[in-house]
């Protein structure tokens, strides 16, 4: 198998990450409120298997997406050239964001262990909130990742212009989701109406982005910076 084909398979890992993430979402259950934790013991006893499976699927999804990030970095840096500052920033921010997604599953996995059977309801609620906060904080580096991808895309046309603007929207959605900690029971909370509108933004970018990468790898010339876009796109990351 030649190098180009390997690179295309690496880009296709974005679809694999999405599939694992979708399977994890399908296992979602309505959790008891952490402000009234008395329902946690019964909930955890009844849903232990689903909770553990969901966490492991999310962990695998995040791990596969880290693999995709390596392919994304190579794709961007070939077009950006020079030091590849923004391509490296996108890669590093994405690794931090999805690393936090992996670590954020640890509290939920802990709740499925045998030692958690005798855990006080209040302690279970604290662990649940801890995992949730980790996942919310992860949106900050993910927003940086999307904005960096957007700037490279709009400067070099390595992705179509419309896909660059989708990256801007995905970054804005991630930034907004980070404000969920301000009102944990508000519309940005995990099961709030606004979160259902904002979380899919990254998927709306990922599917066409991975498709474009697969099609262009190995048969596109290195793009060049468009001076007329430089000033405007720099403003996106200020």
Name these PLM-found stretches.
Residues 1-238:
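Hydrophobic, aromatic-enriched alpha-helical segments typical of multi-pass transmembrane helices
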């Amino acid at each position: 198998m030649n190098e180009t084909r390997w690179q295309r398979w690496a880009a296709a890992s974005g679809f694999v990450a999405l599939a694992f993430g979708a399977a994890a979402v399908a296992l979602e259950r309505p959790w008891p409120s952490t402000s009234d934790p008395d329902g946690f013991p019964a909930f955890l006893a009844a849903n232990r298997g689903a909770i553990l499976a969901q966490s492991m699927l999310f962990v695998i999804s995040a791990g596969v997406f880290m693999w995709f990030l390596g392919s994304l970095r190579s794709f961007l840096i070939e077009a950006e050239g020079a030091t590849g500052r923004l391509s490296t920033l996108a890669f590093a921010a994405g690794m931090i964001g999805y690393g936090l997604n992996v670590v954020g599953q640890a509290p939920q996995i802990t709740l499925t262990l045998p030692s958690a059977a005798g855990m006080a309801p209040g302690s279970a609620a604290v662990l649940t909130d801890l995992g949730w906060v980790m996942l919310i904080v992860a949106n900050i580096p993910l927003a940086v990742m999307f904005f960096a991808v957007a700037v490279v895309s709009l400067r070099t046309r390595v992705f179509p212009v419309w896909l660059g603007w989708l990256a801007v929207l995905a970054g804005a959605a991630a930034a907004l989701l980070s404000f969920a900690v301000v009102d944990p029971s508000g519309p940005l909370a995990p099961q709030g109406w606004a979160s259902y509108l904002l979380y899919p933004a990254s998927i709306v970018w990922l599917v066409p982005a991975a498709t474009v990468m697969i099609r262009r790898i190995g048969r596109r010339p290195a793009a060049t910076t468009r001076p007329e876009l430089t000033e405007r796109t720099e403003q996106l990351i200020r």
